[in-house]
Amino acid sequence: MSPRPPSSPIRFSDLTHPVVAGLISVIVNYGGTFILVFQAAKVAGLSPALTASWVWSVSIGVGLTGLFLSWRYREPIITAWSTPAAAFLVTALATTPYAEAIGAYMISAAAFVVLGVSGCFERVIRLIPSGIASGLLAGILLQFGIGAFSSASIDPLLVGLLIMAYVILKRLCARYAVIGILVLGLALLLTQGRVDLSGLSLQFAVPVFTMPEFSLNALLSVALPLFLITLTGQYMPGMLVLRNDGFKTSANPIVTVTGLGSLIMAPFGSHAFNIAAITAAIATGREAHEDPSKRWIAGIAAGCFYVLVGVFGVTLAAVFMAFPATFIATLAGLALLGTIGTSLAGAVADPASREAALITFLASAANIKLLGIGGAFWGLVIGLFAYLILNGGFPHRAERTESKTPTVPEPLKHST
């Protein structure tokens, strides 16, 4: 592992924005996709104790790995559970005994450890031109930007106020725009009685160990798809999020640490966790801090919030899931506006890769789903194919490094 880079002294005033960015990242994760875990648990016929153990293991694992990686490398390395894998398990657990599924989780996690130690994944990441990476990220995030505004047709008062507040705060005090809409949104929801906390009873989660079983059927029907889905749907775009905002930590330790964490937590129910993609973008850009060297605090904050949720298991996770979907969508979309703008600027900055980057952007935004693999992978494949044909090959590493910084227009360069 490379040595930790130097960081300027941290003042108390440096904490507010990255801590809020970490909190928003956690809220969006639990409020947006965590319901898939409960659906998969229901399909598998898990008891409340086993379901709570799943929540405990994945939350604690995500929190500790993200906290460690962010501290070790002084970069905002946000981790998360594998959302596409959870969606896959909603159907897979219907026909796979739970103990065999646990064994499959462990095999998949061990494969990620091997991948990280081998260094192969980092070499693949370095091959991707920066314009293609920017186009991919912009395409992935576009639906979230659109979602912030399309929610107005369902909840015009809440969404309208949040958008109006965001624009006004951007004009008056841009640094506090995202914090402002978070506070305003929560206050409005509580005033309207749309978030009922009266019945909330915090109880410590108790992990339950399940002895894994191994079978060829689970290897082929669960472990292999789980590995491929998580690799293409989470690790690939997640690493490109970091690269797009100028962070250079190698993929190798990230894949290794999250793989080890997944391996340890699998017997307690955790299916897989990895570097985050969409929610990571909330913490890697300018909204987290003007100074990129201070954004690692967002990774620490997110890790602490995940651990806090994990300690209380289902009860605290249910609070975030109780937030209206329109609030989650609007909060996420507005928090990601800067990153979407920066990514689009980076995609079209280099004339040599502009058309291929736009193809990548549109293909990723289309969210093509084939062979059980999500749109991020196919968007990248189509974009790389277009780049290869249009440019006659991939640029050398030195050329890729040169093109990253000067080609992005200065006003947008750090406007995430």
What is the predicted function of each stretch?
Residues 1-21, 193-209, 391-416:
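Intrinsically disordered, low-complexity non-transmembrane regions of multi-pass membrane transporters
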